[in-house]
Amino acid sequence: NLYQFGNMIQCTIPGSNPLL
């Protein structure tokens, strides 16, 4: 789950990562 990592990079969608 990339929720925590996504949150660090200002990801508004749980489990979603802009870098991916």
From Swiss-Prot:
Top-level EC class as recorded in UniProt: hydrolase
Protein name: Phospholipase A2 D5
Catalysis performed (reactions): a 1,2-diacyl-sn-glycero-3-phosphocholine + H2O = a 1-acyl-sn-glycero-3-phosphocholine + a fatty acid + H(+)
Cellular compartment(s): Secreted
Family designation: Belongs to the phospholipase A2 family. Group I subfamily.
PTM field: Contains seven disulfide bonds.
Tissue specificity note: Expressed by the venom gland.
One annotated GO biological process: lipid catabolic process
Cofactor: Ca(2+)
Keywords: Calcium, Disulfide bond, Hydrolase, Lipid degradation, Lipid metabolism, Metal-binding, Secreted
